[in-house]
Amino acid sequence: MSLIFRRNLSTCLKLFQSTGKPINRFQTLYGNKSSPKSQGNQKRTKRMINGNKNHHHHHQQQQQRSERIIDPRKFEFKEGSETSKSAISSLISKIYYQSSNFMVEQVGESGLIKIHLSKILENLNLSKQGIQLIDRPKSDDDEGGRLLPLIKIVPIQEMNSWYNDLLAKSKQIELLEIGSVKTLKTLEIKLKQEQKKSATKEFQLKWSISINDLKNQKKLEIQKIIQNSKTQKSFLINVVYNKSNPGRLIDTIFKDEEDLEIEFKKRELLKKILEEEILNDLDCKWSVEGDLKTKLVYQVTPKQIQQETNKSVDKEEQPKKEKKKKQLHTQAKPKSKTSEEDLDDLYSFKIED
């Protein structure tokens, strides 16, 4: 035992002499930064930090998924009729054709609002409200040379009527493809009627017209238009240079000052004849826009139409006036009776005196 103790003591003394410093075994174990255990601890802390970051990112992804916008094509309406639902689905497909991400511009009270279509559909009561897709021209400012679809909230009846017209047109196209003769005839009649209703008749006069022609032939033509005013509400008389360049300046036509003065006086005379001798003599009302340097546009309305409109207004007002007269008459009757009774009482009182 003593020998073993001596050996251990001698080895310890040798080590102490070689280093010159007391040995700390804990420092050798944990004090060395480059030890593999300390590196493992550092890696462990890095993993913890990265793990927290990944957890936060995963949480954000979950929130984004929860706030994800619904595809308008998959939107289910609880309210509204089947016609309304099919009408709005047809409009959604039209909007998708114009904007694949369903970003639209809504017509609001404060102006145009850029919004996703699903947000509009969420707040829409399909039993009362619908949407309207307003036509917009193409523009180079927007992506792909197109503006965003313009959406307006309208009453449900307006959307349903649009859808019914769409169905009717599609049926007509189907019948035309089959080769139905009846549909062709009805379409032609409808087109003619629409053209008559929408088109405003225009009567052209050139500045180069002679005064005799204006007083005779053109006056008769204008008179015929006014007489046939049952089908035409109002019409325009355009006094122009020519059809290709109607509003050409007088200075560009006549360079010489004398010619310019003569032309200007002639135009003044034509204007005077047209207004005083033709339009004022005929049964119509008129207003004029433009000037003698370029062109004149007269809007002429026959008085027959105005008389008919006044008659219709009078017819509506007549029953109201009659009712008022009856009410006044009924109110006046008891007053007259009371006044007669008062007179009788006074008369009898005087006789007694």
From Swiss-Prot:
Report whether rRNA-binding shows up as a keyword of the record: no
* Domain of life the protein comes from: Eukaryota
- As listed in the record, the transit peptide stretches over 1-26
Q: What keywords is this UniProt entry annotated with?
A: Mitochondrion, Transit peptide
- Give one Pfam family: mIF3
- Region annotation Disordered: residue ranges? 306-341
Q: Where is the composition biased (Basic residues)?
A: 321-336
Its localization reads: Mitochondrion
Magnesium as UniProt keyword: no
Gene Ontology CC annotations of this record? mitochondrion
Compositional bias (Basic and acidic residues) = 311-320
Query: What family is it from?
Result: Belongs to the AIM23 family.
The molecule here is called Altered inheritance of mitochondria protein 23, mitochondrial
Which species is this record about?
A: Candida tropicalis (strain ATCC MYA-3404 / T1)
**What gene is this protein translated from?**
AIM23
